[in-house]
Regions:
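Short, surface-exposed, polar/charged, turn-prone segments marking secondary-structure boundaries
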Residues: 23-26, 41-42, 129-131, 153-155, ...
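Active-site-proximal beta-strand/loop segments in catalytic clefts of secreted hydrolases
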Residues: 1, 103-105, 128-130, 151-153, ...
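Long, well-ordered mid-to-C-terminal structural blocks that present hydrophobic/aromatic surfaces
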Residues: 119, 125-128, 132-134, 138, ...
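Short, surface-exposed linear patches
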Residues: 17-20, 122-126, 147-150, 170-173
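Short secondary-structure capping/turn micro-motifs that flank functional sites
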Residues: 3-6, 133-134, 157-158, 189-191
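His/Asp/Glu-enriched, well-ordered alpha-helical/loop segment
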Residues: 99, 139-192
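Polyanionic/metal-chelating signatures
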Residues: 1-124, 133
């Protein structure tokens, strides 16, 4: 989940079906995370950042590698069989075949996310954003065509990056005109 910088596929499903094969509606994108979570899970395997900048650096490295490989494939200096699965995934994100569903709370992390969008031309959906307390940040997301899946509303501010979390922040989102939906994040987060 959100402890990984790149966590896996995000899909849209039907919750109540007779046959689990009917549950899958469509692939939505790839789950990614910025901020506190990826740097807080130090016991997990793989390349782990110890700072927010470190998490962004790992994302950028993967995008740069994928962009270089795309160019080599276009010039036939590489064949698709030589591409590892993670780089192939990042090439799908770069070509906008997949969106990134990014776990992000803080305004500064959102600004970094907007820079990644500008640098690599990727499509993103911002998940959470509950620490955003200024309308300008939601307006910047709207200007970059980033929809928001907002929430959970009125959850306990259980980590430092949620110090501005308030159900009142939803007004800033609404006033910005950004596209959004509301999430419960159930059963991960207890509500007040």
């Amino acid at each position: 989940g959100s402890g990984n910088i790149i966590a896996g596929n995000a899909v849209l499903i039907r919750n109540f079906v007779q046959d689990i094969g009917q549950a899958h509606i469509m692939d939505v994108g790839i789950k990614a995370a910025l901020g506190y979570n990826p740097r807080s899970t130090v016991d997990w395997k793989g390349n782990r950042p110890s700072t927010r900048m470190g998490a962004v650096a790992i994302l950028r490295e993967n995008f740069i590698k994928a962009r270089k490989l795309q160019k080599l494939l276009e010039t036939e200096k590489k064949v698709i069989d030589e591409v590892d699965p993670l780089t192939d995934l990042f090439m799908d994100i770069l070509s906008n075949r997949l969106k990134m569903m990014v776990h992000v709370h803080k305004e500064d992390d959102i600004m970094v996310l907007l820079q990644l969008i500008k640098e690599f031309g990727i499509k993103v959906i911002a998940n959470h954003c509950v620490d955003v307390h200024r309308e300008e940040v939601f307006t910047a997301l709207k200007a970059s065509s980033v929809p928001v899946i907002y929430g959970p509303m009125d959850s306990f501010p259980y980590k430092v990056e949620l110090k501005h979390e308030s159900w009142r922040n939803a007004e800033q989102l609404l006033n910005s005109g950004a596209k959004f939906s509301i999430m419960s994040d159930h059963p991960v987060i207890l509500q007040r």
